[in-house]
Amino acid sequence: MCGILAILNSLEEASKLRKKALSLSSRLRHRGPDWNGIYQSSDSILTHERLAIVGLENGAQPLLNEDETIALTVNGEIYNHEKLREDLVATGKHTFKTHSDCEPILHLYEDKGDDFVHMLDGDFAFVVYNKKANSFLAARDPIGVVPLYIGWHKDGSIWFSSEMKAIKDDCYKFQPFPPGHYFSSKTKEFVRYYKPNWIMGDSPSGVLKSEEQVLPAIKEAFEQAVVSRMMSDVPYGVLLSGGLDSSLVASIVSRHAEQRVEDHEKSRAWWPRIHSFCIGLKDAPDLKAARDVADYLQTVHHEYHFTVQEGIDALPDVIKHLETYDVTTIRASTPMYFLSRKIKAMGVKMVLSGEGSDEIFGGYLYFHNAPDANEFHVECCRRIKALHSFDCLRANKSTAAWGVEVRVPFLDQRFLDVAMNIDPSHKVCHDDQGKKRMEKYILRKAFETKEGEKPYLPSSVLWRQKEQFSDGVGYSWIDGLKENAENEVSDEEFAKRESYFPDDTPTTKEAFLYRKMFEAIYPGKECMETVQRWIPTWGASQDPSGRAQKVHLSTTE
């Protein structure tokens, strides 16, 4: 991942604007420690903090078109860049200057104006600026895998940034940029370009009704999603918790790792053995499960430990990077923050991870309490649309804190087209006769193999019950966080919580403590309003941990 900042149509004197932009951009340098670049016109400026993954030698940004009248700053990856490049070259109108996967955006903008973002298959946030027309376009990927914020300055300028910290002090108003939208200077409005039926509030089309249709469709689409995200010119690995989602990702990567996906597996990969990474408290449930999967897949496995006290000590830094006070997100992000530091120290810049599956397939244990298939589907849609505030935010900012990029194949557009058009009855946690079955049954079933075929995963892993990441790294982690909050927040202080925080008042001491830490770095209502809180729709709402759900207790007693 990279860090981008854009200030457009500013009234600030040019030299002062440049100094300010460079200073603010440095707040994003953790996201892109490899190089930084800047483009400036008379009243607008684009900056870029680069993490080089593809096109290492000549992919520095901002990128410019042939006559240098259009500039582009991008954070993300475009997975269909080869096809886009091929089609653009075939028109005879464009000359590519770099091997960057993002350069097609420039030329699509030249050809199609604002109406091209739907053609991109990838995870991205970008701003493209047209010097001749003094116009711009900003956009964010369909689900919000990559962060982007928009702000408004009192002089009328509009600002964009990968993280809130670069714009919070200068903009009187700012907010997360909505996923699946673009914003054009021509209309100064958000326009939704990503409009599948499920995200627009419609029921699933029900195209895939029988298991005979569903199972191969899931398997094929997901395998393609993983392979496309193996595109890299640097060492990469997989985050492996030992749960279903990360294990499936690791299994598919291991099947394709020996050949370079960049040339469609025509040549041997120079990093053929996959490195897998796991973290937890000693004796945590995830550690043994991850070791078992790594042994089965023959990955080069790296296991790291942390203590509860180390996690508590890191909380202010974690909250600074995450820009949230949501309890669930902070609990899960702290181990990931530690792990990303270890990964970067090994020289690895990119990892694949399993975020998104629980939202798509109803994998959280509270989904066992869904009243019917329709409500189950509605909740899946709601969770996916909120991912940019929770798991996507956690995965991106925890890793980007140390200059590591995370890729999430479950949120591939083509895979979503399949998974969200399955008849919801295949996803619910009981069969047609009302008999209970494990969460994400249909995904697990899709990766079962026939006799004589090499299994993707051992049965013990394929059918292992869900552990929320913050639970799986060690049950005493959450208990330690609660105990710490009890010690840090007095009963008297907590009793006055409404006077401290009249808006979105914390309901637990742990939430109160994180809110205090957040407000110390990001004060004011504008910052607070960028945050959402993760609360289960059914079941225990005061404690979002998976352990608080009765179905978890019934399987562990």
UniProtKB/Swiss-Prot annotation:
Top-rank taxon, per record: Eukaryota
> Biological process (GO) annotations?
asparagine biosynthetic process; L-asparagine biosynthetic process
Q: Which Pfam families match?
A: Asn_synthase (PF00733), GATase_7 (PF13537)
Q: Where is this site: Important for beta-aspartyl-AMP intermediate formation?
A: 355
Q: Which Gene3D superfamilies match?
A: Glutamine Phosphoribosylpyrophosphate, subunit 1, domain 1 (3.60.20.10), HUPs (3.40.50.620)
Describe the reaction catalysed, as an equation: L-aspartate + L-glutamine + ATP + H2O = L-asparagine + L-glutamate + AMP + diphosphate + H(+)
Question: What does the record give as its pathway?
Answer: Amino-acid biosynthesis; L-asparagine biosynthesis; L-asparagine from L-aspartate (L-Gln route): step 1/1
Annotated L-glutamine binding lies at 50-54, 75-77, 101
Every Asparagine synthetase domain range: 217-466
Q: Where does ATP bind?
A: 239, 279, 353-354
**CDD domains from the UniProt entry:** Asn_synthase_B_C, AsnB
Q: Where is this region: Disordered?
A: 538-557
Q: Which GO terms describe its cellular component?
A: cytosol; phagocytic vesicle
Under what name is this protein listed?
A: Probable asparagine synthetase [glutamine-hydrolyzing]
User: Which source organism does the UniProt entry give?
Assistant: Dictyostelium discoideum
